[in-house]
């Protein structure tokens, strides 16, 4: 029996395939997952809107593996989304790499997205 914060079997299986430089996409319901996630394994967690939150998923994943880099999508108007401070709190030793919308989509389509 797992005694870690993260116990979801599909996520644990996907993380077991990761190595240095692998990427994991954590997205909310607004992300065009079917079109912009390439061959990555998809794990659907939505129970109802906002549950679980992206930050909750990040915390659970971070509890079982090291995170080397964090890439986030720039907003259309260039403002910083309210969620960025939550990411920075969970990943205090990392700078958030801000990518434009289509650059972010391209990054999510890469072969190293698990």
Regions found by a protein language model. Name each.
Residues 36-72:
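A phosphate-binding glycine/aspartate-rich beta-alpha loop in the early core of alpha/beta enzymes
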Residues 1-47:
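Long, hydrophobic N-terminal alpha-helical segment
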Residues 75-114:
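Long, charged alpha-helical interface segments
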